């Protein structure tokens, strides 16, 4: 039995590669079922965000190569290209990695809380797909518990920062007074919701939320006193926007160079600040070629968050210690779990012997034997049969020179120098 955590993230792969290896919500269930069908994987879950695509697996033996080959084939890129930026963690290292990810210790923004919710969503989708069972399920529950402990027992979450907060911080650097700025937010998911709240707190003059469905855009807009439009209405609104921040799950770009050029003309080339948080990207990279556009992607946010990270570095060590403890606790419980099946089988074996010997004793009594004789026969039968298999195996192992088996037997049966301890 083996646990694996493999994939790519913002530290190992560029945004170009990450967007090619990303899974859309619509792909997830079938991808999980296909993964379990065509690779030697018993249980699986997929976490796909703008900063990482990771697979969490339970296999009988480590078969990472087969999974990487499937991942490359699924996303139509070469195996060599994927291997160049992929990582594979096995067993306790896989457990530790999952717990670090869920705790925000492996995030672009140290300690950011959104990743835990994203991991819980990944677990829920895996349950829907039927690809997660008792073993991976236990690992997810242990991961969530450790992440909660990290969040409550350390200062890792203080001075809240996130990709959303970093985007707004960058906007504040470019526009000294956000209260005179107008913002267009594309999408209505968790990240855009956080962006909207941060902008609202900064007193942005006007916020417009554009989404594929008006219902979700309206719900977010109502919360903040903003305006809601459909994606199709963006060209009519774009020229009003000083700030454009986009994060959707679209497979195709939402904004192209031509649309932005038209908006700039209507703005008389007043600068526009744009942040594309999506993977795959919502805003064509060519937009960044325009003179009056400041276009940033998630990979450009590193410097913005550097200052905020300093305040969390002290808490990171305490968080790492909690993750190490959580990892060891889970692995210990897993080792104990491995003994359960053996103990269950041995108990069933002992109960069969007990039932057989009890039946013999009852027949002796029915045939007129004394209770003393029946009990003596029962005791001898139980002793001989319970000791028979261990005795045969110990002699065999001793003859083979397996002296460690004798020491283990003494420990197993709590024997000391060949006799039972009083």
From Swiss-Prot:
<feature type="binding site">
    <location>
        <begin position="112"/>
        <end position="114"/>
    </location>
    <ligand>
        <name>substrate</name>
    </ligand>
</feature>
<dbReference type="InterPro" id="IPR036453">
    <property type="entry name" value="GluRdtase_dimer_dom_sf"/>
</dbReference>
<dbReference type="GO" id="GO:0050661">
    <property type="term" value="F:NADP binding"/>
</dbReference>
<dbReference type="InterPro" id="IPR015896">
    <property type="entry name" value="4pyrrol_synth_GluRdtase_dimer"/>
</dbReference>
<feature type="binding site">
    <location>
        <position position="107"/>
    </location>
    <ligand>
        <name>substrate</name>
    </ligand>
</feature>
<feature type="binding site">
    <location>
        <begin position="187"/>
        <end position="192"/>
    </location>
    <ligand>
        <name>NADP(+)</name>
    </ligand>
</feature>
<feature type="active site" description="Nucleophile">
    <location>
        <position position="50"/>
    </location>
</feature>
<dbReference type="InterPro" id="IPR006151">
    <property type="entry name" value="Shikm_DH/Glu-tRNA_Rdtase"/>
</dbReference>
<comment type="subunit">
    <text>Homodimer.</text>
</comment>
<dbReference type="Pfam" id="PF01488">
    <property type="entry name" value="Shikimate_DH"/>
</dbReference>
<dbReference type="Pfam" id="PF05201">
    <property type="entry name" value="GlutR_N"/>
</dbReference>
<comment type="function">
    <text>Catalyzes the NADPH-dependent reduction of glutamyl-tRNA(Glu) to glutamate 1-semialdehyde (GSA).</text>
</comment>
<keyword id="KW-0560">Oxidoreductase</keyword>
<feature type="binding site">
    <location>
        <begin position="49"/>
        <end position="52"/>
    </location>
    <ligand>
        <name>substrate</name>
    </ligand>
</feature>
<feature type="binding site">
    <location>
        <position position="118"/>
    </location>
    <ligand>
        <name>substrate</name>
    </ligand>
</feature>
<dbReference type="InterPro" id="IPR000343">
    <property type="entry name" value="4pyrrol_synth_GluRdtase"/>
</dbReference>
<dbReference type="InterPro" id="IPR036343">
    <property type="entry name" value="GluRdtase_N_sf"/>
</dbReference>
<feature type="site" description="Important for activity">
    <location>
        <position position="97"/>
    </location>
</feature>
<comment type="pathway">
    <text>Porphyrin-containing compound metabolism; protoporphyrin-IX biosynthesis; 5-aminolevulinate from L-glutamyl-tRNA(Glu): step 1/2.</text>
</comment>
<dbReference type="GO" id="GO:0008883">
    <property type="term" value="F:glutamyl-tRNA reductase activity"/>
</dbReference>
<dbReference type="InterPro" id="IPR018214">
    <property type="entry name" value="GluRdtase_CS"/>
</dbReference>
<protein>
    <recommendedName>
        <fullName>Glutamyl-tRNA reductase</fullName>
        <ecNumber>1.2.1.70</ecNumber>
    </recommendedName>
</protein>
<comment type="similarity">
    <text>Belongs to the glutamyl-tRNA reductase family.</text>
</comment>
<keyword id="KW-0627">Porphyrin biosynthesis</keyword>
<keyword id="KW-0521">NADP</keyword>
<dbReference type="InterPro" id="IPR015895">
    <property type="entry name" value="4pyrrol_synth_GluRdtase_N"/>
</dbReference>
<dbReference type="InterPro" id="IPR036291">
    <property type="entry name" value="NAD(P)-bd_dom_sf"/>
</dbReference>
<dbReference type="Pfam" id="PF00745">
    <property type="entry name" value="GlutR_dimer"/>
</dbReference>
<dbReference type="GO" id="GO:0019353">
    <property type="term" value="P:protoporphyrinogen IX biosynthetic process from glutamate"/>
</dbReference>
């Amino acid at each position: 039995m083996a646990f694996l955590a493999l994939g790519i993230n913002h530290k190992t792969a560029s945004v170009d590669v990450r967007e090619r290896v990303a899974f859309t919500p619509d792909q997830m269930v079938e991808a999980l079922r296909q993964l379990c069908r065509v690779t030697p994987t018993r249980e699986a879950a997929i976490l796909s965000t703008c900063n990482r695509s990771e697979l969490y697996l339970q296999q009988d033996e480590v078969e990472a190569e087969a999974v990487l080959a499937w991942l490359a084939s699924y996303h139509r890129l070469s195996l060599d290209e994927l291997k160049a930026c992929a990582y594979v963690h096995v067993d306790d290292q896989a457990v530790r990695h999952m717990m670090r990810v869920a705790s925000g210790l492996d995030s672009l923004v140290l300690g950011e809380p959104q990743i835990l919710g994203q991991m819980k969503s990944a677990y829920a989708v895996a349950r829907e797909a039927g690809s997660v069972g008792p073993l991976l399920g236990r690992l997810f529950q242990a991961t969530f518990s450790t992440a909660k402990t990290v969040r409550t027992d350390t200062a890792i979450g203080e001075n809240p920062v996130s990709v959303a907060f970093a985007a707004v911080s960058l906007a504040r650097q470019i526009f000294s007074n956000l209260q005179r700025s107008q913002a267009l937010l594309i999408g209505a998911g968790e990240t855009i919701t956080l962006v909207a709240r941060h902008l609202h707190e900064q007193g942005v003059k006007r916020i417009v939320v554009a989404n594929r469905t008006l219902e979700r855009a309206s719900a977010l807009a109502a919360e903040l006193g903003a305006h809601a439009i459909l994606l199709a209405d963006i060209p009519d609104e774009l020229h009003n926007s000083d700030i454009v921040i986009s994060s959707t799950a679209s497979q195709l770009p939402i904004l192209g160079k031509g649309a932005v050029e038209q908006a700039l003309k209507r703005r008389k080339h007043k600068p526009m600040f744009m942040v594309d948080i999506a993977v795959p990207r919502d805003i064509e990279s060519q937009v960044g070629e325009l003179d009056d556009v400041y276009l940033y992607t998630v990979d450009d946010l590193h410097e913005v968050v550097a200052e905020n990270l300093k305040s969390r570095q002290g808490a990171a060590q305490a968080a790492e210690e909690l993750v190490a403890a959580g990892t060891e606790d889970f692995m210990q419980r897993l080792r104990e779990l491995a003994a359960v099946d053996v103990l269950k089988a041995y108990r069933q074996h002992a109960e069969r012997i007990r039932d057989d010997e009890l039946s013999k004793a009852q027949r002796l009594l029915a045939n007129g034997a004394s209770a003393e004789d029946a009990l003596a026969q029962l005791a001898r039968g139980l002793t001989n049969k319970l000791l028979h298999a261990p005795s045969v195996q110990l002699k065999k192992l001793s003859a083979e020179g397996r002296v460690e088996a004798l020491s283990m037997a003494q420990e197993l049966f709590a024997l000391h120098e060949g006799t039972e301890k009083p």
